[in-house]
Amino acid sequence: MRLLFLLFLLLVCLAQKTSGRKRNTKFRQCEKMGGICKYQKTHGCSILPAECKSRYKHCCRL
């Protein structure tokens, strides 16, 4: 019973780890496009079509 619980716990941890990697690749698209995540109040940059972690930031190429 204890072994079954440990296997289940390992499965849950692996599932969390893989979902976290998918989330990080989604937010690294800005860096791959040559941009950086900046606050929306910054001026003088062109906005790129990529997502940032914070909803108050956008992907910006200076």
Curated annotation (Swiss-Prot):
Disulfide bonds: 30-59, 37-52, 45-60
Domain of life: Eukaryota
Protein keywords: Antibiotic, Antimicrobial, Defensin, Disulfide bond, Secreted, Signal
Gene Ontology cellular component list: extracellular space
Signal peptide residues on this chain, from the entry's feature table: 1-20
Family named by the database record: Belongs to the beta-defensin family.
This protein's name: Beta-defensin 33
